[in-house]
Swiss-Prot record:
UniProt gene name: nusB
Pfam families documented for this protein: NusB (PF01029)
A Gene Ontology molecular function term of the record: RNA binding
Domain of life: Bacteria
The species this protein was found in: Methylococcus capsulatus (strain ATCC 33009 / NCIMB 11132 / Bath)
Protein name: Transcription antitermination protein NusB
Coiled-coil features, chain-numbered ranges: none
Length: 198
């Protein structure tokens, strides 16, 4: 599991969520996220090299690390009590595979009918009634099952579960796991059978 891909999925969930709710244009959403990623990398690098950031830059970096950085396991500290230094030391550099982020964002949007049809067989309600965070995660996971056969299904499933734990409601990871596991059995039948045999 590549950290850069994990962070690309994390950014894609947020971008797909934004697209689902606001229906902003994909190029606008993509541009916003790519610009924010570039700014996060630049500010993080300057901070890590010991350069003094201005108060607005520090605030931006804190927000961007929260949005794009992946925590390495923080203590039980209230989010608003975490200083920039603590957050930076507890986060991995926001080194997102931008190409993969773009593929996921556009792949979901361009294959929406196909993805929703594959998911609908296993949903307990219409796709539009699924929580928007869960819906974004399900669509991205389904896209990867269908279009990224080189990525093992367990990686895709585990990443989706982790995203649901991070962004979703308390038990949403169970729902995401149940739906995507069934989709995997359909889309990755050969891989699943080989795993059971071996």
């Amino acid at each position: 599991m590549s950290l850069a891909r994990t962070l690309a999925r994390r950014a894609a969930v947020q971008a797909v969520y934004q697209w689902q709710l606001a229906r902003d244009s994909l190029p606008d959403i993509e541009r916003q996220f790519v610009e924010e990623l570039q700014l996060a990398k630049s500010l993080y690098r300057r901070h890590a090299e010991g350069f003094e950031l201005s108060p607005p830059e520090r605030e931006q970096l804190e927000e961007l690390l929260e949005k794009f950085g992946r925590s390495q396991g923080t203590d039980e500290v209230e989010e608003e009590d975490v200083t920039l230094e603590q957050r930076a030391s507890q986060c991995q550099v926001p080194d997102v595979q931008v190409g993969y982020f773009k593929e996921l964002l556009h792949g979901v949007a361009n294959n929406l009918a196909l993805l929703d049809a594959a998911l609908a067989k296993y949903l307990d309600r219409p796709i539009d009634e699924v929580d928007p965070v869960e819906r974004a995660i399900l669509r991205i996971g389904c896209y990867e099952f269908m279009r990224r056969p080189e990525t093992p299904y367990r990686v895709i499933l585990n990443e989706a579960i982790n995203l649901a734990k991070e962004f979703g409601a308390a038990q949403s990871y169970r729902y995401v796991n149940g739906i995507l596991d069934r989709v995997a059995h359909e889309c990755r039948a050969v891989e699943m059978a080989a795993r059971r045999r071996g």
